[in-house]
Amino acid sequence: VWPFRRKVRASSGRLTRLLVILAVILALCAAGFFLLPAGRALFEDTRDKLGKPVPITPVTTTATTESARHPATNTTDGVRNSYWGTSPGASVTYTFRTPFRLVDVIITNGAGFTPKEYATQGRALEMDLEVTTSSGEKKTKKITLADKAGTHTIVTAFSDVKTVRLTLNSPAGLTQGRQLALAEVEFFKRS
């Protein structure tokens, strides 16, 4: 019967089929190449969420300015009612022994954890978080904090972190005789 027994020439459509297959393979390779960074970020983000954050303590804490009674080391002493006293625009740098994946930063802003302690000094409502990797690359994140006592958890996703610098901006409650205060900064790495 005619429609079912057509004569087909040899190699009919083989070249077209081959070109289509090669085009599909090339498109898949290109998509894989261009989507690899997004896939890697998604993979790392998933690992961050599935793992339990573990606290990590810096080996050194240095500041651009500090008062004698309220040094920058008060931000990592584990006590939330002591603080680093400084002026607007000052920064504190935390250096770590080995590079790690920074997952979270918990900031206790102001002079302390309770509302009464919090209101005794000025506090920063904005901070610049600058991370330096072991290769020297710098990454920055702008942080906005609520003007209230307690902790503020900042979710980060920085790999290969060696140092962290916090710069205090946008002071609130800073009047005559008061300092800009930062009570505690806690760092968490991926487990």
Where are these regions (language model features)?
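A short beta-strand element within beta-rich, extracytoplasmic domains
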Residues: 101-119
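Beta-strand-enriched, solvent-exposed domains that form extended recognition/catalytic surfaces
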Residues: 79, 103-106, 138
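Extended extracellular/luminal ectodomain segments enriched in beta-structured repeat modules
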Residues: 89, 97-106, 161
